[in-house]
């Protein structure tokens, strides 16, 4: 999870993580990207998106966080880190549309709030 990336990387790191998977035949994985929004006194609204892929046998690429270096999205042969080096927009698309979901929701929320305040 996002808030624990640095801690996980420091405690375990890519190479120890991949070592745990060295004999694993099922290397399927899911990358989930979530955003949450919460106003005081209200219930949080969560937006998520992502995709499926596989865990590589070795770390590849130089950009991104630890998981970017071994996660290969379905339909690709390169890790997210390698894709980012070549085409940032393509790499970003594999994170899903959680940010877009949030933006649409927030924009609509603000429009509704404005209209209700001014009785449109």
Label every PLM stretch briefly.
Residues 1-120:
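Anionic-ligand binding patches
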